[in-house]
């Protein structure tokens, strides 16, 4: 029986076991997906000796995605471009890895807001932390002419923009309001609006009527930003879909079956969020 896990610190709140457990049951596969907390001071040694840990592969979450990437014998193009890996597997005892965050983000948009990238001109990304890398990469892959990157610390946005090239334009937080006027899609990658954090307060009235607003946060499922966007009549994309879609390639790699992100899976995770009081802000 294949055994895989989610590796990070902490991982107690990870819903990945629920996601993969759903697919294992759905397809009648004898497999196990567990949580494995790896202390930061043990991470480098853990991934360096991954073949000895008893796992066929797994997912990596914060704060270990970069450490895991550095331990890889081979990495897929997305992982190489971003310098982080979130999906691992073994081939002949060698550790291989991929980054499925960017494809997961795009798949979520494709399913939830079809045609969102039909005429890709300007996208606005809020935040220059770890989550923003996959989002920036995704927008560039879909051919956006310009991706505005806003961060409270401008130097951080500038450093990230330098990594991705001239189509990514760093702006200060005070430039967000003006940028909303030209953005076709807005993606929040900050923790603002997350449970226990202050809301992301933006004036969405200046957005075009066909604009799409996305959030990588899924606790709460409907962030204040998404709630405001819905009230404005805009199409919205929550962060739960990204979590579900990014999980597909790993499951296919480990178990040989490409699973579907269906209503039953989403309902399962939403029910878990509801049980923990995490649906609303």
Curated annotation (Swiss-Prot):
GO cellular component entries: cytosol
GO molecular function, one term: shikimate 3-dehydrogenase (NADP+) activity
Entry-linked InterPro entries: Aminoacid_DH-like_N_sf (IPR046346), NAD(P)-bd_dom_sf (IPR036291), SDH_C (IPR041121), Shikimate_DH (IPR011342), Shikimate_DH-bd_N (IPR013708), Shikimate_DH_fam (IPR022893), Shikm_DH/Glu-tRNA_Rdtase (IPR006151)
Residues the entry annotates as binding shikimate: 14-16, 61, 86, 101, 218
Swiss-Prot/TrEMBL catalytic activity: shikimate + NADP(+) = 3-dehydroshikimate + NADPH + H(+)
Residues binding NADP(+), per UniProt: 127-131, 151-156, 216, 239
Catalytic activity, EC: 1.1.1.25
Protein name, as recorded: Shikimate dehydrogenase (NADP(+))
Record organism: Azorhizobium caulinodans (strain ATCC 43989 / DSM 5975 / JCM 20966 / LMG 6465 / NBRC 14845 / NCIMB 13405 / ORS 571)
Organism classification: Bacteria, Pseudomonadati, Pseudomonadota, Alphaproteobacteria, Hyphomicrobiales
């Amino acid at each position: 029986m294949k055994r895989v896990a989610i590796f990070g610190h902490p991982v107690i709140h990870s819903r990945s076991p629920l996601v993969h457990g759903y697919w294992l049951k759905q397809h009648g596969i004898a497999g196990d997906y567990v949580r494995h907390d790896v202390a930061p001071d043990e991470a480098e040694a853990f991934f360096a000796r991954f073949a000895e840990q008893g796992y066929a592969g797994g997912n990596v979450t914060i704060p270990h995605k970069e450490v895991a990437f550095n331990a890889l014998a081979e990495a897929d193009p997305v992982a190489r471009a971003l310098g982080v890996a979130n999906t691992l597997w073994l081939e002949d005892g060698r550790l291989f890895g991929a980054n499925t965050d960017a494809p997961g983000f795009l798949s979520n948009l494709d399913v939830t807001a079809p045609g969102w990238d039909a005429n890709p001109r300007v996208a606005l990304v809020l935040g220059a932390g770890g989550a923003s890398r996959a989002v920036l990469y995704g927008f560039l892959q879909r051919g956006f002419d310009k991706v505005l990157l806003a961060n409270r610390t401008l130097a951080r946005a500038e450093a990230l923009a330098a990594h991705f090239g001239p189509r990514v334009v760093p702006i200060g937080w005070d430039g967000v309001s003006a940028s909303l006027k030209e953005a076709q899609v807005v993606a929040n990658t900050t923790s603002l609006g997350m449970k226990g954090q202050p809301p992301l307060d933006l004036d969405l009235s200046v957005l075009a009527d066909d604009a799409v607003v996305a959030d990588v946060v899924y606790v709460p499922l409907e962030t204040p930003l998404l709630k405001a966007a819905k009230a404005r009549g805009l199409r919205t994309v929550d962060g739960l879909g990204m979590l579900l879609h990014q999980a597909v390639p790993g499951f296919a790699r480990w178990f040989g079956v490409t699973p579907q992100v269906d209503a039953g899976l989403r309902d399962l995770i939403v029910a878990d969020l509801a049980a923990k009081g995490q649906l609303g802000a």
